[in-house]
Amino acid sequence: HTDKERVWEFVNRFASFNHFVYSPVANYYGELYSLPFNMNTFYQLWGTKTPKEAMKMIERQVKEAGITEPSNLEEQAIRLVGKDIYEKLVKGYTRKQWGMECKELPAFIIQRLPIRFTYDNNYFNHPHQGIPQDGYTAMVGKMLDGIEVQLNTDYLQNREKYDNLAEKILFTGPI
């Protein structure tokens, strides 16, 4: 997915793309919720039908929590989406992703949480989205056509040799 025309034109030199819209669904103990957080999510949780109703519900929960200056991820998430969404859709996912409790993580981690007051389940707001029809392996293979690729090579042991091969070296191994 991209919003950059130049990037889209570049990758289309190597592959044809199937149309694809990423619209994930969260499963909380058998209850299914639309992602990113949007009017479908708010309706599924609270039965709210308008952005105004959803905003009021979030504002009420934020006010009840009394959070004005979030000091950790938990507080920041509650301030952004309210207690219900935090408890059902943020807390467990974040704990699993980071291996830490939300109270132990800094607030800035969740500042980019997508929240939309529309009935749009499209996770990305990009005009170009797709999956290569022949797969990513075929696409990358075409991108690397004519380029020497060395696998299972210890760059760090042979650094001087490889550094002299080109002006720029892209090292993707562990440091």
Where are these regions (language model features)?
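Active-site/ligand-binding neighborhood in enzyme catalytic cores
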Residues: 22, 26-167, 172
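Aromatic-residue-lined binding/catalytic grooves and analogous aromatic/hydrophobic interfacial grooves
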Residues: 175
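Glycine-rich FAD cofactor-binding loop and adjacent beta-loop-alpha segment at the N-terminus
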Residues: 1-14
